Every structure is written in C-alpha cells, then in structure tokens.
C-alpha cells in the first residue's frame, strides 16, 4: 500500500476540489481518507491525518458502520478477480469479475486507483444475494486487513 503517494495526491486534489475531500473517523482508532468521492484509503491514528484537510475529522455513523469489522462482510463476501482493462469515455478502467451462480458479472473501477496497492491486494465486495447485483463498494484487502474502498463506475452481466 502506497500511503505516501495517496497523501500527496489527496493534498494536491484538495487544492483543486476541496468539497470532496474528507477524513472520516471509523472504528478502532482508524480514519478513512477520501479526496474525490470514488475512492479512499484507511489510515491509523499514528499516520496523523486528522488535519490533512481544513474541515477536520467527520463523524458519520454510516461511514463508521461501512468499515465495522462486524458488519462489512456480514452478508457474505465475494472475491473479485482482475479480468481485463478497458477504456470508457477516455477513462481507463480495471474490470473485476465475479460469478454468482452461472452468470458472470463485471465490476468496473477506475484504473488510476490501483497504483496505491500492492500486486498482492485482493478485491472483495459484500453481497446481499448471489442472484442480484448489489455492490456499494469494492473493498481492497492486503494481508487480511481492509486498506481501502473503491466505488464502482458500473456493474454489468456478461
């Protein structure tokens, strides 16, 4: 996980677009930092990100619940496998796939966010049903710990 690069990019983006930048207080002395609304990474208190942006730390129960160790995968988790890269309206996308039952589903995320994670990172989504597409975010896991969350651009069936 490349925390330093992420923090550099977050600070630079904050100057251009401060309304999307947030530091959320989540569980267990951790913070979720996002700078564009589509992607964020998890930091420890020791990383000193509380004052990264001028608006300080936000406390939203829904964000804290999203990353709660008890609820993040309470309805099941699906491993998403990198499938291929595509381009949509000039934006490079990484396609992740999963197969509930007999139908393959593609989950499209912005490729640029992949640079912050190791090659061994795993991608998961929580699912309410194996028969329905319900993805509120792609969780990035390194060494068994959730380190980030990416919002999908699109989900489809092939």
What name fits each language-model region?
Residues 1-158:
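DNA polymerase processivity clamps
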């Amino acid at each position: 996980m490349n925390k330093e690069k992420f923090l550099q990019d977050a600070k630079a983006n904050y100057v251009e677009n401060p309304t999307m930048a947030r530091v959320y207080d989540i569980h267990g002395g951790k913070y979720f930092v996002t700078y564009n609304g589509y992607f964020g990474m998890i930091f420890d208190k020791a990383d000193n990100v509380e004052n990264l942006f001028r608006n300080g730390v936000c406390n939203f129960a829904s964000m804290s619940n999203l990353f709660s160790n008890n609820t993040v995968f309470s309805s099941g988790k699906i491993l998403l496998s990198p499938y291929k890269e595509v381009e949509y309206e000039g934006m490079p996308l990484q396609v992740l796939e999963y197969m509930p039952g007999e139908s393959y589903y593609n989950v499209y995320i912005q490729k640029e966010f992949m640079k912050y994670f190791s090659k061994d990172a795993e991608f998961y989504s929580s699912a309410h049903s194996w028969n329905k597409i319900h993805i509120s975010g792609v969780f990035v896991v390194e060494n068994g710990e959730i380190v980030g969350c990416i919002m999908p651009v699109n989900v489809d069936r092939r």
